[in-house]
Amino acid sequence: MQSFRKIWNKPRPDDWMPLARFYYADSALNDIASELDSFDGRRDPDRCNALVTRLRVAQDRVLHIITEMLIHLYPREQDRACRDFRVKFPDEILHDTLPGQLWFGAECLSAGSNIIDHETESDLIRPLAKDVTKQLDFLRDLLKNQSLRDPSAYNPVIKENLLKFDKLFAEFEYQYVSAMVPVKSVKEHDSQLDVAVLFSEVLSLALVKDLITQDLIDYCDPSVMIAIPRLGIVWGLLVYSNGALNVDVPAENLSEMFRPFYSLLVKIRNLLRILTPTELTKLETVLCKGESAVPEDTSSTLTMSDFRTNATDEEKAKNNQRVWMCDMPSDSTSSLDSSVQDSSSETTSLASSALASPHSGSEENVSQIENEEGDDEAIGTNSNSSNEVTESPETIEEPDNVDMEESSESEVDTHIDETRNESDDEITDDVQASDVLQVETKKCKSSRLLEQKKFDKSVKTIIPMQTDPRSQIDPKNLRSRFRSSEDLVHRLFVCIAGVADQLQTNYSSEIRKVLKLILQPSEIIPVYEVVNAQVANSQTEGEETGVEAQETLPLPAFMGVRWVPDEDCEQCTACSMPFNFVRRRHHCRNCGRIFCHKCSCNTISIPEHGYDRKVRVCNLCYVHRLNSFGCNEPMSQVNENGATVPSVTEQQSAQTASASS
């Protein structure tokens, strides 16, 4: 009986209904599976790999058609299985071939295979995989039998099994993907949404301040993608301080993207608070432009290039470097020394790589930004214990040490001369910097410790024991660390741009997802509100409530064109040649009218009507669809009564012809 149905009731290959397309997709899948089982894959691995690829493509096509049936039968998302968990998945997981990969994985797990390096997870989800494959095989048999009976109807058994399979497949998708890749937790997802809200507010504020134009957003200019994270750091620390960049809370409460830069963000926030409105505007401008136009004065700064090229001014530069380092706190000096020697520290690696700037003195920029609060942190540390200064061996005043340090000046000069005379290919910049800075640090430490011992005694009576050092920052003291206003703006630009660039590099998928949320928002479906809180009575009034109006909105679906019945047309619509045994009727898939073979010999794909592959269309529709400067509507359509109604283009042409006559 099944064979006779296949012969007489087999759907047409060009039928756009989902059940008809499922029949041919399922038949192709069975053919590939039979061919794959008919030979030994170890003898011909290339052919086996090619067949496996074709099998996964065929499985993916079958699942897409089943999904289309579910959408057609249950248009509302709440009637189908919930898949909101997909927002926790990485972007590289969500693609069109995911259903086919899940089916293939379920087949492998059902056969006894394990996920590589995930044997425990494989044993846990194996029963669910068997249920999915069993339900899918049963559903395929039901759909294939129904496609041979009536491709346009769905009985209650099919509807029930479609929903059952949808729920099983959604549950298997979550467990399988969770076993394969790390999935975000609820807290991490909420933190990512907070960052999206911050960037959205930043984009709106940037439009108000004319830092970003609407044209740049419409054209998706790369400068917008670069400027939004940079401005987000500035305004997230100043304007929206209680949002995603609230550094007053522990680092664990921040987003995963900003957590590695917690200490650096605190220091950037403190520097941003001492900026004047003019300086803040200048900083925002240079962050949007992508480059700092602030000239840097290096007359009092010793850089690495001075050791290599400035032989005549070596002594002067060396003395300036000593004076500058003696003025710095001991914590800052030690941190600067360790930042040159040990590049594995978090903020130092950021300074040496992402915060690198073509401007001279960039090494000093990062070191001073990293240690801008050296005095305050040292104060807070020393105030926690009254005996710390006296007990520490480094803080004991030793005149012999001072004399010894003073007597070593000649050794320092000799060491610098030897370092300068060595070739660049034998001694690197890092070695030169570490040698010089170690000696200079020893010379300045004794004088610094003498001042610190006297200063700690007075600080203990001013700052309480449990006071946070960050709350005692003096704006004047911070500003005095920089040579000028331009120097402060430039150093902030280097650090903020470096953090933003690190976000773009290390968290590219998260940044891309956040930018997609704010630059390509989801379409908002309008909901009609009830006026004056009056609920309509469906029996007496024709007015609908807001929920009813929302449910009756038109839903996107593939709708076919109504065809002209064969008995209503005895001749070709284009050439008016009568149909006979030789000249057969052909329907145009675009307009639904009947033509002969000569007038409908063209084929083209019509995705909006459900035809993904090429189908037959008449010559007129073919020309109109290929003409990019013309309209794509059919020349005429068929109304509900079966009568041919001319299109707008034909009506305008007829009116023009009648007016000219």
Swiss-Prot record:
Keywords: Metal-binding, Zinc, Zinc-finger
Biological-process GO terms, alphabetical: negative regulation of epidermal growth factor receptor signaling pathway
Deletion phenotype: Causes ectopic vulval induction.
Compositional bias per record (Basic and acidic residues), positions renumbered to this chain: 412-422
Comp. bias intervals (Low complexity): 330-360, 381-393, 651-661
Pfam families tied to this protein: FYVE
Record's compositionally biased regions (Acidic residues): 394-411
CDD domains attached to this UniProt entry: FYVE_LST2 (cd15731)
Ranges for region Disordered: 294-432, 641-661
Zn finger (FYVE-type) location: 566-626
One function term, GO molecular function aspect: phosphatidylinositol-3-phosphate binding
Residues involved in Zn(2+) 1 binding: C572, C575, C596, C599
One cellular-component annotation, GO: early endosome membrane
Keyword Zinc-finger found: yes
Comp. bias regions, Polar residues: 297-310, 641-650
Top-level taxon in the UniProt lineage: Eukaryota
Residues binding Zn(2+) 2, per UniProt: C588, C591, C618, C621
Tissues where this protein is expressed: Expressed in vulval precursor cells (VPCs).
UniProt KW Zinc-finger keyword: yes
PANTHER family recorded: LATERAL SIGNALING TARGET PROTEIN 2 HOMOLOG (PTHR46465:SF2)
Record's function text: Negative regulator of epidermal growth factor receptor (EGFR) signaling.
Family named by the database record: Belongs to the lst-2 family.
Protein name: Lateral signaling target protein 2
Species this protein is from: Caenorhabditis elegans
Gene name for this UniProt entry: lst-2
